[in-house]
């Protein structure tokens, strides 16, 4: 028995004689009362592998039949808000330790293992199969094991150093597992994460198994190997003598990955700059560089030559059948990949594949999964790829954001805005008293938060942070369907993806129905994109539909409506070019017209009357100001429970609608007046306060 640093438990029973069958078992041990054992072992004399899984579940499996006949389990009932996803706790050092450990008993055919770090997934979790790159160890997901293990049954393919199974044989290894998984969990997707060479393997498998529900995640796929910058150097590698081979993997390591990015993984961004630099220096000199010299043991000379041959055959095989791929595909491409032209390949695959999305990481190298970036699970969530049946359900399949995701979003996504606007929150109690904080907002759902959409939706980030930190509530906000469009073959993982990580959903009546039915806190802006992209002179003006759109649905579920107002957009920027101004510029006119025409396919507000029906999408011209402050006021909650007349009587519902609208307008007027009394409205005053009050956790504001 050998236990490695990545908590992999290996139970080998290897007979290395060529005329005897080889057996190999790997077990994932899970703490807690309910344990699962996954046995993956060869069953054919030719060394191919099939999967046999036995799962003990005290509640019983509640498989979804794809037609909605059974009540689906809700992921957020099993995973708490701000859970620990473990990303950053393991680094490339752990990868090398795990790789060395698994190579100690490295005989036999290709096999599968389930890392113990993955733990116990949520109920009805789909399967994720990791197909490794050139190293073949299967340890390329080490930094992601804990996070992925919450959402998937994870199995990783290990190809022993001395194994010489051809590409077609590896296809059979994967297909045997797919067939067994399809028989065990017939109504669930199967995820194939293919790293580099594994990307060729995943595409080839998908082309040969078009009837299966597969989701491919291709990380710098080696389908572009024939166009690699290294092609002129490959003949030289074959002539390097054995005694000098140790230099080859060492040199390749600097081409395949970014050592600085690898060393940065796991260093806390909250640390002072000097401390971070010192930690990075120590990791580079004491950990990274010594570890790179060990690559020769992972990829010996004969193995390297075999892997290059395997890469050529895999690249040719996958490209010859790429037209047959029907699977859902997500390509992750690094901008600094020195081994493959990954960004160019991502564009090519986006054009060839029928259902392909792309996310580019411009600062990463070839070994993206081992470098400092974003958790793979975060990328899957942000691109809307996580589902547990044949289609995504925004309620039951939603994975709450983790502690690490919140920290990254606050520091790297909101960043300057969050610190500059110094947001202040007020709410109204049932007796009408206005208090600081969010105490007046009900804790139990369903709750419908209805308010004013500030310029470009700048109020969303600080508001989401306040609800999470003060009330431990994640509200679900609506997003324009254009954010779910993946037509850009060079798209980065950006703000639009992050709002999906934090619960945004496409704006449809059906989705609002589902969320209220699940007793969620739901954020609604009746003014939509038209209000967020308003013209000059329209700040703080409600551009709402003439007739109510939400009161009757709220009443159907007995939801509490909380109207709110926000102010502060005019304190951070001056709107100088609005839609009317931009349409007078010929080049911009053509661009905005084309974008607006493309968005009409979403058919938003087709039946609405008035100005709100006009929702052109554009970027307004802004001149920044010395930042002021954002203010939020949540009005007195309006109960709809026990008022069945609101469901049946449109006039009664419209009266409540007008009441909500008036309350939002009153909140805005109140904040505009009271902010004049705030001695710390300017960022300069708040900065001075923070410097003179080092123990203060929050800069004060006006008294309500």
Swiss-Prot record:
Transit peptide per record: 1-27
One GO molecular-function entry: diacylglycerol O-acyltransferase activity
GO biological process: cellular response to nitrogen starvation; leaf senescence; phytol metabolic process; plant organ senescence; regulation of phytol biosynthetic process; regulation of triglyceride biosynthetic process; triglyceride biosynthetic process
Gene3D superfamilies hit by this protein: alpha/beta hydrolase
GO cellular component term of the entry, any: plastoglobule
EC code: 2.3.1.-
Main location: plastid
Deletion phenotype: Plants lacking both PES1 and PES2 grow normally but show reduced phytyl ester and triacylglycerol accumulation.
UniProtKB keywords: Acyltransferase, Chloroplast, Plastid, Stress response, Transferase, Transit peptide
Entry's induction text: Accumulates upon nitrogen deprivation. Triggered by NAC072/RD26 during senescence.
Location within or outside the cell: Plastid, Chloroplast, Plastoglobule
Source organism superkingdom: Eukaryota
Family that this chain belongs to: Belongs to the diacylglycerol acyltransferase family.
Subunit structure: Interacts with PGM48.
Function per UniProt: Acyltransferase involved in fatty acid phytyl ester synthesis in chloroplasts, a process required for the maintenance of the photosynthetic membrane integrity during abiotic stress and senescence. Exhibits phytyl ester synthesis and diacylglycerol acyltransferase activities with broad substrate specificities, and can employ acyl-CoAs, acyl carrier proteins, and galactolipids as acyl donors.
Protein name: Phytyl ester synthase 1, chloroplastic
Species assigned in the record: Arabidopsis thaliana
């Amino acid at each position: 028995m050998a236990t490695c640093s990545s908590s992999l438990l290996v139970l080998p029973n290897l007979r290395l004689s060529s005329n005897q069958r080889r057996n190999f078992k790997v077990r994932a041990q899970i703490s807690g009362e309910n344990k699962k054992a996954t046995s993956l072992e060869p069953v054919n004399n030719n060394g191919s592998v099939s999967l046999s899984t036995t799962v003990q579940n005290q509640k019983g499996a509640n498989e979804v039949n794809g037609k909605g006949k059974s009540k689906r389990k809700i992921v957020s009932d099993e995973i708490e808000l701000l859970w620990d996803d473990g990303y950053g706790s393991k680094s490339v050092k752990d990868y090398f330790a795990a790789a060395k450990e698994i190579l100690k008993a490295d005989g036999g055919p290709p096999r599968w293992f389930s890392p113990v770090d993955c733990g116990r997934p949520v109920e009805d979790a789909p399967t994720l199969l990791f197909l490794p790159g050139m190293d073949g160890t299967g340890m390329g997901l080490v930094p992601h094991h804990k996070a992925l293990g919450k959402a998937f049954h994870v199995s990783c393919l290990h190809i022993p150093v001395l194994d010489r199974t051809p590409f077609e044989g590896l296809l059979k290894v994967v297909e045997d597992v797919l067939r067994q998984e399809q028989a065990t969990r017939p109504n669930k997707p199967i995820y194939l994460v293919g790293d580099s060479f594994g990307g060729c393997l995943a595409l080839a498998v998908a082309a040969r198994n078009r009837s299966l529900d597969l989701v491919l995640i291709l990380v710098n796929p080696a389908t572009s190997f024939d166009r690699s910058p290294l092609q002129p150097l490959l003949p030289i590698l074959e002539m390097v003598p054995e005694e000098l081979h140790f230099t080859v993997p060492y040199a390749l390591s600097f081409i395949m990955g970014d050592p600085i990015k690898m060393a940065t993984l796991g260093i806390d961004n909250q640390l002072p700059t000097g401390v971070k630099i010192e930690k990075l220096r120590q990791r580079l000199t004491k950990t990274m560089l010594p570890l790179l010299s060990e690559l020769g043991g992972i990829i010996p000379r004969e193995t390297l030559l075999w892997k290059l041959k395997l890469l050529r055959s895999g690249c040719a095989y996958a490209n010859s059948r790429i037209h047959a791929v029907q699977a859902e595909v997500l390509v992750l491409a690094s901008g600094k990949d020195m081994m493959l032209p990954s960004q160019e390949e991502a564009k090519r695959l986006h054009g060839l594949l029928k259902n392909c999305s792309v996310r580019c990481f411009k600062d990463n190298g070839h070994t993206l999964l081992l470098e400092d970036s974003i958790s793979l699970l975060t990328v899957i969530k942000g691109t809307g790829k996580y589902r547990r049946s044949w289609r995504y359900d925004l309620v039951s399949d939603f994975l709450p954001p983790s502690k690490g995701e919140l920290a990254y979003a606050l520091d790297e996504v909101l960043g300057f805005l969050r610190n500059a606007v110094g947001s202040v929150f007020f709410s109204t109690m049932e007796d009408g008293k206005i208090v600081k904080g969010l105490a007046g907002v009900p804790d139990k759902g369903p709750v419908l938060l209805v308010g004013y959409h500030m310029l470009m939706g700048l109020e969303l980030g600080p508001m989401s942070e306040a609800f999470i930190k003060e009330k431990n509530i994640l509200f679900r906000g609506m997003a324009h369907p254009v954010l779910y469009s993946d037509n850009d073959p060079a798209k980065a993982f950006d703000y639009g993806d992050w709002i999906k990580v934090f619960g945004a959903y496409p704006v449809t009546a059906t989705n609002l129905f589902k969320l209220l039915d699940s007793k969620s806190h739901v954020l609604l802006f009746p003014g939509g994109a038209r209000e967020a992209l308003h013209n000059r002179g329209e700040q703080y003006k409600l551009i709402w539909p003439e007739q109510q759109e939400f009161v009757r649905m709220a009443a159907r579920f007995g939801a509490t409506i909380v109207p709110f107002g926000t102010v502060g957009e005019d304190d951070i920027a001056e709107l100088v070019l609005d839609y009317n101004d931009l349409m007078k510029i010929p080049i911009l006119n053509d661009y905005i017209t084309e974008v607006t025409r493309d968005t009409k396919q979403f058919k938003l507000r087709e039946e609405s009357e008035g100005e709100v029906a006009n929702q052109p999408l554009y970027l307004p011209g802004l001149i920044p100001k010395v930042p002021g402050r954002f203010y939020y006021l949540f009005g007195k909650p309006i109960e709809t429970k026990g008022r069945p007349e609101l469901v049946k009587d449109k006039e009664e519902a419209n009266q409540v609608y007008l009441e909500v609208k008036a309350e939002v307008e009153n909140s805005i007027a109140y904040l505009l007046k009271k902010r004049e009394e705030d001695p710390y409205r300017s960022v300069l005053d708040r900065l001075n306060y923070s410097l003179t009050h080092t123990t203060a956790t929050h800069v004060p504001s006006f008294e309500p």
